[in-house]
């Protein structure tokens, strides 16, 4: 569920979240029976992921990107981008 292209560099304490355990909080509620949050994570070539980054389910990070320390990546990041904070 996690694919890293060639020449991806990871700093320490990087977290790849391929599923959201938060859905367990309401799993018995029939109204939310179809809510499942999981997805593949892809990181493109020549990308650097900084210290303490959290990458959420279903995210694609493009080629030649820099993801700054402590970022929480909740959506796709296009090629040649710098992303910090909660992009």
Label the model's feature ranges.
Residues 48, 66, 82-84:
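Short-chain dehydrogenase/reductase
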Residues 51-66, 71-75:
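Beta-rich strand-turn-strand
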Residues 77, 81-87:
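C-terminal end-helix/capping segment
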Residues 1-60, 86-87:
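Flexible, glycine/small-residue-enriched loop-and-beta-strand segment within the central core
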Residues 5-7, 11, 64-70, 80:
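Outer-envelope exported proteins of Gram-negative bacteria
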């Amino acid at each position: 569920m996690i694919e890293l292209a060639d020449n991806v560099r990871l700093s320490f304490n990087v977290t790849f979240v391929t599923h959201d355990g938060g859905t367990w909080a309401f799993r018995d509620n029939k109204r939310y029976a179809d809510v499942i949050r999981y997805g593949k994570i892809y990181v493109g070539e020549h990308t650097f992921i900084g210290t303490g980054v959290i990458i959420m389910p279903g995210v694609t990070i493009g080629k030649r990107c820099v993801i700054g320390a402590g970022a929480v990546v909740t959506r796709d990041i296009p090629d040649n981008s710098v992303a910090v904070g909660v992009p």
